[in-house]
């Protein structure tokens, strides 16, 4: 994997990540394909919209159909018919979400499946082996996702554990003959000094890219923004910077401003299934009665399949009837909106007008905004 910066505007930057399966233009958004599929979409549709990379969840694929099954079939790309890059997480966040069903030690983590209660054990070496079997293009180290709130003493112990796991992941990774890349994960809760210390330790290990993990888990937005502002500029300039699990576009703008290159989140797809849609005029809830006889397109400025073919009235009808087509049409639109937003943002950085872009979009993104719980994605079934 190679990373090249094409243009900078302040700390915001646009670039390309070169992988064996294709180029990823950054800043990049990765739709979440929990079980190997972006919900309600075919891989071909996701690609046609313009996405160059998706994220798949190691935890879910490990439990079913199983990483060995996917390896036998020929790897995750063949299995799901997606021939562009894939990033797999290590499963750390999903295991963290199990709370009472897990036990963490220096050796690894023991947990019970949320599906059938069966007992499992994953250590750093196994986390790498699972991702090797899946055949993703970018792998993540096993880490402990720190809950919020957490006191400083707990966080300090946790980052020592994550650092030790990162060393073991890298040592095991280096024994393999693979084209895959491995990213380290910076933990540390809301304590900037501990985050900086964690980053310094990861830099000694040396990874292909670096991720900020453990945010968007219930902490105030101001804390999230402060961590990104304090940490991102200290990450190696010549390697990708990834903010894990963050996808609210307001948060994205603040993060890109400080040098973040990669994002993933279930927001566009989950919101689509719940009837919340992003438009050039702000968010709308399609279930509202005001759209019952509205024959205008969802977003007059959008060229997606949904907006070119269907009215707000029809989309509301589908949603209130709980038709499966509602999920599909809404998801097509939200993913299209996100993809075009990132394209426009990259263009703004390339033309050195990112601040104008941010100033233009913040009021739009805040319009009709309803506060969504930061911990909505803690439920494994929400993926």
Curated annotation (Swiss-Prot):
Q: Which NCBIfam families does the UniProt record give?
A: Q_tRNA_tgt, tgt_general
Q: Which cofactor does it need?
A: Zn(2+)
- Recorded protein name is Queuine tRNA-ribosyltransferase
State the oligomer form and interacting partners. Homodimer. Within each dimer, one monomer is responsible for RNA recognition and catalysis, while the other monomer binds to the replacement base PreQ1.
Q: What are the catalytic residues? A: 89 (proton acceptor), 264 (nucleophile)
Provide an example Pfam family for this protein. TGT
Q: Does the keyword Zinc apply?
A: yes
Cite the HAMAP family for this sequence: Q_tRNA_Tgt
Could you state one GO biological process linked to this protein? queuosine biosynthetic process
